[in-house]
Regions:
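Periplasmic alpha-helical coiled-coil/stalk elements that build and connect Gram-negative outer-membrane
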Residues: 2-3, 142-256, 366, 370, ...
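Gram-negative bacterial Sec-dependent N-terminal signal peptides
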Residues: 2-28
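Acidic, low-complexity, intrinsically disordered peripheral segments
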Residues: 3-4, 81, 418-454
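Bacterial Sec-pathway N-terminal export signals of envelope proteins
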Residues: 27-76, 82-84, 111, 126, ...
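A glycine-/polar-enriched beta->alpha junction
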Residues: 37-47, 54-69, 106-124, 134-141, ...
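Small/polar, glycine/serine/threonine/aspartate-rich low-complexity segments that form flexible
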Residues: 74-111, 234-245, 277, 290-327, ...
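Transmembrane beta-barrel architecture of outer-membrane proteins
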Residues: 102-104, 149, 194, 314-316, ...
């Protein structure tokens, strides 16, 4: 592809795609909170967790039905016909036919009076619903972090492209200056060749930056379920919030009380304990009350005798006590299995705590490190500007060569790119720290929205 060395290069297909796909996106610029809310409506992982929470609630309602009475209606209809020999005298017998038609119904009702296993099953279902709700909250926190990462990836890619384009323009100007100086005999061809090489390299970087921006935009659009999502850029100079609380022990304490992963492990242990108690309850008797009420209407027609009609009723109440005596060691082995699984759940809970504490400490150190990197890069950016100004002045008076100017320019634009990326990563690092502690929510997005151009 030909490169214009006197100015900016012509528009590439990637840039054209960006203009066509996202040129009208300014009207769709959205804050981070708005983008996260939109993603909740389309993200498969979040929607799956929400459906799982709904299913867990319905399983709990199913378990509760064991405490409620059950009733059923049975309706019977029958028609019988029979023929039998009937003596009519001492010497004569005739075949007599009898036809019977009946219609009846019976209502049966049952109520559990005592069943300890049912009680514990309900408690387990309630705990499992709590786990599903915690998983939903965890999925929401994960979605916030993923959207924020994609959101700031777009901004970082846009800043990187701006830096590369600025560097390309500066190199083009330096190339034009080198050519003029060579033509008038004030410089050698070496300066021109160095500027041309830098221009070619800058063009390659610009193409890569354009592609990175396009990929970042497509990724964000897919995550949000919309086309042309345009993140609000960061207000500069940016005043980034510090990591608060400032002590890692405070974050660890928050994680031990609020971490969704730790909550799930602890409730999972409670479920396992209930499973053990439920298995042991297999040794206990059960008591069930039953009630029955039925009515039947019958009509019988007998040849030679006429038709007879009658009604019958029956009602009854009973209590059934079931006492387990021997089950082939089934219950004992069920108890042993539940005890083993309970021990596993206890070990898993201890392991989950260790993992949560480690993740929180790691996220805390990462956030502090990212904050320090932002400060260092911002200082480096200021120093690079001063260095470039001094180099340009030295070039004008003849104590610096063209290569020195090109190096100073590249250093400045690279530092600007890195500083911008570090600021975005610091904001994401803060969200990841709150995610590790289990406190991440919508309110944590509002301070970030305040840092963005509206």
């Amino acid at each position: 592809m030909p490169i214009s060395r006197a100015g900016l290069a012509p528009m590439t297909p990637i840039v054209a795609a960006l203009v066509l796909a996202f040129g009208a996106a300014a009207s769709q610029a959205q804050s981070l909170s708005e983008v996260v809310q939109a993603a909740r409506g389309v993200d498969a992982a979040y929607l799956g967790a929400r459906s799982n929470a709904d299913a867990a609630h319905y399983r709990y309602e199913q378990a509760r039905s064991a405490h409620l009475p059950t009733a059923g209606l049975q309706v019977q209809a029958a028609r019988d016909s029979s023929t039998s020999p009937t003596p009519i005298s001492t010497t004569a017998i005739i075949n007599q036919t009898s036809k019977t038609t009946s219609l009846g119904g019976t209502v049966n009702a049952q109520q559990n009076i005592f069943n300890r296993q049912n009680d514990l099953t309900i408690d387990q279902a309630q705990k499992n619903e709590d786990i599903a709700q915690s998983q939903l909250a965890q999925a929401d926190q994960d979605l916030i972090v993923r959207v924020a990462q994609a959101y700031f990836n777009v901004l970082a890619a846009a800043d990187a492209l701006n830096s590369v384009q600025g560097n390309s323009k500066a190199i083009a100007e330096q190339l034009a200056s080198a050519k003029r100086n060579f033509e008038v005999g004030n410089a050698t061809i070496t300066d021109t060749r160095e500027a041309e090489a830098r221009a070619d390299l800058a063009r390659s970087k610009e193409i890569a930056a354009e592609n990175d921006l396009l990929v970042a935009k497509v990724t964000l659009d897919q995550l949000v379920g919309r086309n042309g999502v345009a993140p609000h850029p960061l207000i500069l100079p940016a005043t980034l919030p510090p990591v608060m609380p400032s002590q890692v022990s405070d974050w660890v304490a928050l994680a031990e009380s609020d971490s969704q992963a730790l909550k799930q492990a602890r409730v999972g242990l409670e479920v396992a304990e209930l499973a053990t108690a439920r298995a042991r309850a297999g040794h206990l008797p059960t008591l069930v009350a039953n009630a029955t009420y039925g009515r039947t209407r019958a009509r019988e027609a007998i040849d030679g005798e006429g038709t007879f009609t009658g009604n019958s009723r029956n009602a009854g109440v009973s209590v059934t006590l079931n006492v387990p005596i021997f089950s082939g060691f089934l219950i004992q082995n069920q108890v042993n299995e539940a005890v083993a699984l309970e021990q596993k759940a206890r070990t898993d809970a201890d392991g989950a705590r260790n993992q949560v504490v480690l993740a929180t400490r790691t996220a805390f150190v990462g956030a502090l490190s990212q904050a320090a990197q932002v400060k260092a890069l911002e200082a480096a950016e200021a120093s690079s500007k001063l260095s470039l100004d001094a180099t340009l002045l030295g070039f004008k008076v003849g104590v610096k060569v063209n290569l020195d100017v090109l190096n100073a320019q590249s250093q400045l634009y690279d530092t600007q790119r890195d500083a911008a990326g570090a600021r975005y990563q610091y904001l994401v690092a803060q969200l990841k720290l709150r995610q590790a502690a289990g406190t991440l929510g919508n309110n944590d997005l509002l301070p970030i929205d305040a840092l963005l151009v509206r």
